[in-house]
Amino acid sequence: MVTKDRGRWGVVLDDDSGTPPGDGAVLNCMRARELGRTNIVVGDRVGVVGDVSGREGTLARIVKLADRTSVLRRTADDNDPFERIVVANAELLLIVCAVADPPPRTGFVERALVAAYAGGVTPVLCLTKSDLADPAEFAAEFAELGVPVIVCGVDDPVEPLLDVVGGKVSALIGHSGVGKSTLVNRLVPGADRATGVVSGVGKGRHTSTQSVALPLAGGGWAIDTPGIRSFGLAHVTPETVLDVFEDLAAAIVDCPRGCTHLGPPADPECALDKLEGASHRRAMAVRGLLVTLQDNEDWELDIDRD
């Protein structure tokens, strides 16, 4: 599945080798009635019947949705029970973040890391706009997490990133204005993804309005997704959040039994309070998320009791 727009899906046929070819015709497809309201997203592998010639004006039917190997999800905010599937079957999640204009946000990256690990996708941090600021300081925030960091400014070679994504299905996410579409155009010359400018208040202009999978010259796919303003994690469990961050997971080994890691007064001896530097900042941000997720669980328990 390479495109989705208003009840129509674009599908490229493969040759059963497991990797779709980059030069196949895009079939215009509708969802078969027997699939009901099954959510089919970019990255899904599907079975189609009917006219599969790809000629203009033809329409095939999607009759089967294959099991997904990974699912990247998000919610509008941390209290929203409605999950949105960003992409299916991605192997890599390229978290695109500018080091300036707009200023980088550690919270967004960390939330994307949680969603990636929860969805079975391997994250890679891609730092853009290195011509405007030194990316080293922001990259250091994640040094203890073992996440690959690739500097992808317009003056930096794109080959290191191409080496990573070659032969794989990679999804790109990022706030509007961080240079995601520019990066896509470098990965897939001729993709002609629209690029925009950042407004005077540091907010980007949405230039990618629909997700689309683009074939890489060396094999594999780059899935460009619309710029996002929020990355809610209401669908993630508190245990998953802590397991994502190696520095936090190592620290809570020293917590007393029964510690919920929510901090005082409930957990006055939580080991997260003893961390320093980037780990302490991350622990406090994660704690805020844990409080919200715990409130969600308590609310669900109250509903069940009713």
Model-derived regions, located:
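Canonical P-loop GTPase G-domain recognition
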Residues: 129-178
